[in-house]
Amino acid sequence: MADADEGFGLARTPLEPDSKDRSCDSKPESALGAPSKSPSSPQAAFTQQGMEGIKVFLHERELWLKFHEVGTEMIITKAGRQMFPSYKVKVTGLNPKTKYILLMDIVPADDHRYKFADNKWSVTGKAEPAMPGRLYVHPDSPATGAHWMRQLVSFQKLKLTNNHLDPFGHIILNSMHKYQPRLHIVKADENNGFGSKNTAFCTHVFPETAFIAVTSYQNHKITQLKIENNPFAKGFRGSDDLELHRMSRMRSKEYPVVPRSTVRHKVANHSPFSSETRALSTSSNLGSQYQCENGVSGPSQDLLPPPNPYPLAQEHSQIYHCTKRKDEECSSTEHPYKKPYMETSPSEEDTFYRSGYPQQQGLSTSYRTESAQRQACMYASSAPPSEPVPSLEDISCNTWPSMPSYSSCTVTTVQPMDRLPYQHFSAHFTSGPLVPRLAGMANHGSPQLGEGMFQHQTSVTHQPVVRQCGPQTGLQSPGSLQPPEFLYTHGVPRTLSPHQYHSVHGVGMVPEWSENS
């Protein structure tokens, strides 16, 4: 299809002297850009034998002349852009029963390259090599002469592109080059095609349709004309000429998408209030960190300003760069409201603060028993008062069988093993070694877990070591049966099953008994 014009002898450039001399049954061509008295005067460049009497009239010729007087520009894009004004013609003189094929091509008007400077177009050099010629065949082709003469023939779906590898059949053009559209009327052969040597055709050229291909409008007058007459550009109407010209140039370019976070960061950096906001946006739980870095004794929490609901990006960088070394330099005694690090952190490069929590060894039995009674799970004691720990002596759950008391049972000691990765409670608290350590549980449901409950992160072996214990033999402290590293968190699930809940409570809250108790 690209080389079909050579098949039936189409001239490469329509403005050659010989092609002008071969003009047939049409009025003389007007000068380039000069208005004609007859707005519907047909123009023809070449006619073969058998195609006499065919006349073509350009639709909206007055509009084309307005653009031509200023210097028509057509946008070309990689994806393809339609022409405006659209190329529409009225055809007469066809044989109503003969089938015709209507097609267009766009050829270079000259061998120059142009530039727009000082509000005018001027030649800047020699033209680049022309792209391989492409023909745009009207979608209704082939059709009878009666069909073509019944209504306007529109080529508004024709698109212009600057993509030299375009696979969609668009017309390929070079930017800043002048082109001339041409209309070809071809008599279809017996196969409803064309291209043979005996194919009859005629070519029609309208000089006022010549244009310069551009990637963005150069002349603001063309921009204004397009906006005033293009029904798809209504959104730009009502603005001044310079603004419309600027917007039209911007629309033809591709700009990168800037993330919102980058915009916020730049606004925060360049805002005249950014430094003041940073100084006043320190939250109460981060005040000790900044005071530790600056070496200034911190005020009380009441003097700290309220937290900023929109923290800046600089605050986060300061938070995550507080290291353990800074915490050691600024002890907890210097800032009583600053909670110290735990004794063992997961790694040496731990760059965030862990809140310190009261350890089991520092709590008395009465305090821990009282705190256990204050939890959402209220323990019901059914043992006599003479027992050492009545609140943990006879506890039962409706899902476990009752067991003998501690005074006559075989106690299962847990042997510490190598640390295993963290598992959910259902994985290492529902097995055998911890269940015999608990006495029979009283019948009660498992309510929600309170905020102050602790959980530990450790995994133990499930191979028990059995020893006999009498009433005088104390129960080994759970702290001595576990590895030294614990991790306490506040985010404990609130809907644990009964066995999970009591396993955690039995291990984390059981009193420490010495050998003399």
Swiss-Prot record:
Disulfide bonds: none
PROSITE patterns linked to this entry: TBOX_1 (PS01283), TBOX_2 (PS01264), TBOX_3 (PS50252)
Comp. bias (Low complexity): 34-45
BP GO terms, sorted: animal organ development; atrial septum development; atrial septum morphogenesis; atrioventricular bundle cell differentiation; atrioventricular node cell development; atrioventricular node cell fate commitment; atrioventricular valve morphogenesis; bundle of His cell to Purkinje myocyte communication by electrical coupling
Compositional bias ranges of the Basic and acidic residues kind: 15-28
One Pfam assignment: T-box
Keywords associated with the record: Acetylation, Cytoplasm, Developmental protein, DNA-binding, Nucleus, Transcription, Transcription regulation
Cellular compartments per GO CC: chromatin; cytoplasm; nucleus; protein-containing complex; protein-DNA complex; transcription regulator complex
SMART domains: TBOX
Region: Disordered, residue numbers: 1-46, 270-313, 331-369
Listed GO MF terms: DNA binding; DNA-binding transcription activator activity, RNA polymerase II-specific; DNA-binding transcription factor activity; DNA-binding transcription factor activity, RNA polymerase II-specific; RNA polymerase II cis-regulatory region sequence-specific DNA binding; RNA polymerase II transcription regulatory region sequence-specific DNA binding; RNA polymerase II-specific DNA-binding transcription factor binding; sequence-specific DNA binding
DNA-binding region: 58-238
Subcellular localization: Nucleus; Cytoplasm
Post-translational modification (record): Acetylation at Lys-338 by KAT2A and KAT2B promotes nuclear retention.
Residues bearing PTM N6-acetyllysine: K338
Positions with biased composition (Polar residues): 271-300, 357-369
Assembly notes: Monomer. Homodimer (via the T-box); binds DNA as homodimer. Interacts (via the T-box) with NKX2-5 (via the homeobox); this complex binds DNA. Interacts with GATA4. Interacts with KAT2A and KAT2B.
Comment text on domains: The T-Box domain binds to double-stranded DNA.
Described function: DNA-binding protein that regulates the transcription of several genes and is involved in heart development and limb pattern formation. Binds to the core DNA motif of NPPA promoter.
Entry protein name: T-box transcription factor TBX5
Organism: Rattus norvegicus (Rat)
Gene: Tbx5
